[in-house]
A protein has these predicted regions:
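NTP/phosphate- and nucleic-acid-binding module
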Residues: 1-441
């Protein structure tokens, strides 16, 4: 993509109303623009980031789940059946259609997916089942703030498991636990699973996945040993491997503030290993048994011909929230420092002297060759000053930046900058394509 053809309205100054780093940088880099309180339009750069996050999530979720797509607007009756229509409170946006039917703008999908299951699955032979979808949701936050970190409208991946008994349901929960560790690892994040409150979703087992960040609204208490753990590729059908992985990760104390047992924390975690930090929630797991299957009649016939209500779990990842969380973790004073898997473009090309014919020729050639290799490239071909172009590249966080200027070309080299480390190397013109290919993971 050439910068002259790309809609990218960057800002030089910090917006006065943006209080946290991610909100400021998402506005300045042209990722988003506010439409109303807690509601944002996503511009091309932001959409590219969302798409990259989605791609990682979908790739991993497809290993243990099946993708569906449910509507944003739901019939209020199923929420009345579950008992959550009144319990959910003012965060739920309630509306009437032209026929005076009560509808809601879905804040979550437990009721709707349970109804889909109830109407279409009859036999134990169809279990276990796991379904996920990615959809925009709405919760009428009383104080929307921090940009998309706590907005009213947000993009979310939610998955739902259906099992014949509690043992199988816990295995489904554990598979998702490991799946989430892999998802966040692929995004370059050190996620920490912590014991959590079940909130309005309900149930008796729950974990939040959080990343440590100064601006996090949650507070976690954990053993530093959890940060030393790593997750490797795993066979999701191997119960022993999956359960052992979960047992290892949960063997270290880690809790949210809501579920903290202070005495237990002090007793189990050595003083030098205690971590008490602000963190951002990026994922949440819930096991709630038959909380929804009973009122919504989600049952199957078992081997003995008896009707059994299925055991369920739900599992969420905030896609739009993740975009902000990643920025909170990966940024510096110049702008965003995207991990490669999330970056809107992997390579940026800056022509430092736009009216220099040799610079233009070399820039165009490198751009064409990188595009032919299938790499995502942003070529800043604008007739702007070099300083402005370089500042924009750092602001939007492109991982690898190729700088082409007349002085370096005289000596037959080009500068290649790695955004996260700020390291700049001089690469010969003939080797730049091969070098970029080797660098990109």
């Amino acid at each position: 993509m050439k910068r002259s053809n790309f809609f990218l309205p960057t800002l030089k100054e910090n917006p006065v109303d943006a209080k946290i780093v991610s909100h400021r940088l998402m506005l300045r880099s042209g990722m988003i623009r506010q439409s109303s309180a807690g509601i944002y339009s996503w511009l091309p750069l932001g959409v590219k980031v969302l798409n990259n996050i989605e791609s990682i999530v979908i790739e991993e979720q497809n290993k243990i789940s099946q993708q569906i797509l449910m509507p944003t607007i739901q019939d209020a009756n199923i929420w009345k059946k579950s008992g959550r229509y009144e319990d959910y409170g003012k965060e739920m946006l309630k509306i009437l259609d032209r026929n005076k039917r009560e509808m809601i703008y879905g804040p979550t999908n437990e009721e709707l997916v349970t109804e889909i299951f109830s109407n279409n699955v009859m036999s134990y032979k169809d279990l276990p089942m796991n379904l996920f979808h990615i959809q925009w949701k709405f919760r009428d936050e009383i104080r929307p703030r921090f940009g998309v970190m706590r907005g009213r409208e947000f993009l979310m991946k939610d998955a739902y498991s259906f099992d014949l008994n509690e043992e199988e349901a816990i295995f489904s929960y554990n598979r998702m636990f490991v799946n989430y560790l892999n998802i966040f690892k692929k995004m370059g994040l050190q996620s920490i699973p912590v014991k959590a409150d079940t909130g309005p979703i309900g149930g008796d087992l729950s974990h939040e996945f959080v990343v440590i960040a100064e601006t996090g609204e949650s507070k976690i208490f954990c053993d530093s040993k959890v940060l030393e753990q790593n997750i490797n590729d795993i066979d999701y059908d191997d119960k022993t491997s999956v359960n052992n992985a979960v047992n290892l990760w949960t063997s270290f104390y880690a809790s949210s503030e809501e579920t903290l047992d202070k005495e237990e924390y002090l007793a189990l975690v050595k003083e030098g290993n205690r971590i008490e930090k602000n963190a951002i929630e990026v994922g949440h797991l819930f096991y709630f048994g038959d909380k929804y299957s009973l009122p919504l009649d989600a049952s199957v016939i078992n081997k003995e011909g008896k009707r059994i209500f299925v055991k369920m779990g739900s599992y969420g990842i905030g896609i739009s929230r993740l975009a902000a969380a990643i920025i909170e973790v990966f940024h510096d004073e110049k702008g965003i420092c995207w991990p490669e898997n999330i970056a809107p473009f992997k390579v940026g090309i800056v022509n430092l002297r736009q009216n220099d014919k040799n610079c233009e020729k070399v820039s165009e050639s490198i751009y064409d060759n990188l595009c032919k290799l299938g790499l995502s490239v942003l070529y800043d071909d604008r007739n702007e000053g070099a300083g402005s172009k370089l500042a924009d590249m750092d602001l939007i966080g492109i991982p690898w930046q190729i700088r082409i200027g007349p002085n370096s070309l005289k000596n037959n080299y080009i500068e290649l900058k790695q955004r996260q480390s700020s390291e700049v190397n001089e690469i010969s013109v003939s080797e730049i394509i091969n070098e970029v290919q080797k660098k990109i993971t």
